[in-house]
């Protein structure tokens, strides 16, 4: 007997008889894969792949002799924060124009207006550029400083340090790339309007003053948030997740980590956990860091300036530190670290590309590459496809396949329409109305559907989920994995055995959307209903992954779980003779 014949006669029939157990095995393997990733045998050590960076290999000279410049900048920033409530940023931008014009640098105040349904915002950015003495204005580096962070805390030390550094940088002739300094009045709307105008894009929601100051291709950049708070902290928090789950090149983080930790002895905060230069990490801490990184990447909400730049092929990080008193903060130590970072980025001959763009950072020493974590979601997608096949082979041959397919397709359209209807409001009553409306649609469908129709609808649904999860995982692994976990009960609904257990799975699937929203509310520290937030980010920031996944993967399960529940409930008895489990 040939191998092909053996597989066809023996293996395939055996697998077909035990599809349910094979599907269950794949699901357990896919879910447990994540718990293997933080082990020492799997993780990789962080290292700089781009040899041209040479992080920390230069002498820094931003020292106490520049204390007069730093002191005057801090005094001015403190004055601007006191005047902000009455005159806004007008006084600050006027003073900045005088400062940089006296230095011989071009300046511009860019006004912009954000208009979307339910929200309107008017603001302005300040832009200046230090031309490279040894460059030809074809490449540049970016230094961004939001005047306030996303919760309204002033960034006095950050603005003062940026002014002092640009004055200091002007005295050196080693720069081969222009240095663009942008000060935003808002950490989200400001970068959005700046990028839209810098790349000559048009959008119906943003109107802005055209940029007169331009430079070459932006290679990389940093955003400084040295926010003034009641508590002082010497820990540097590094933010790197961007919209749609995008990430900057890993070499940018490696450069920051090596310079700030090894050369200037700053502790680093990643995903809410602090790490010191000489400290290690345990399996438990790495697992917690991995989960927090996955949740943050899955949400991909825009709260800092760096989040919008990777979609324009600009590698960007936000460096955040809490400063109780800007005048007692060690500006020179932090400024030397920024100087060393920009000196390293100045060595680049091309865009960062040698290292990874898909990864999870576990601590200051280790990360997980895409080749190690992707099998988990692909195994889960395979289990969904097996579930679709299990329901498919059980249908009667003479049944009209277009009928259940039409039900499935119409359910998707109803869900998308319902999402757009409620995306302009944050009231909880709107969310309840959405839930009840989709539930009512599911009840209506169940009155016209037989159990065979419901089983085929479930087959179509699982097949589409498998394909969509596989595609989304290549763009945002975390989001696809979280959604796959929420949909696990759906794939174990069975019309052939154990009706009570299948009814329980249908109920769990029905409430999975509510659980999903509550989890997001905890992560975002915001309202229970983030529909309006997602719609705003979709229109302004091209953040399309979350709303599209929610419309296509999560909300339809309200309808499908209801139809499956009532089809199972109305079934007179569980079938005992089945083709397969």
Curated annotation (Swiss-Prot):
Q: Keyword Lipid biosynthesis on this protein? A: no
What ranges does the Lumenal topological domain annotation cover? 39-366, 425-427, 489-500, 570-581
Please tell me which stretches of this chain the record labels as motif Prevents secretion from ER: 577-581
Its placement in the membrane is given as: Multi-pass membrane protein
Instruction: Write down a Pfam family by its short name.
Output: Gaa1
One GO biological process this protein is involved in is: GPI anchor biosynthetic process
**Which pathway, metabolic or otherwise, does it act in?**
Glycolipid biosynthesis; glycosylphosphatidylinositol-anchor biosynthesis
Q: PANTHER family this protein is in?
A: GLYCOSYLPHOSPHATIDYLINOSITOL ANCHOR ATTACHMENT 1 PROTEIN
Record's protein name: GPI transamidase component gaa1
Q: Which gene encodes it?
A: gaa1
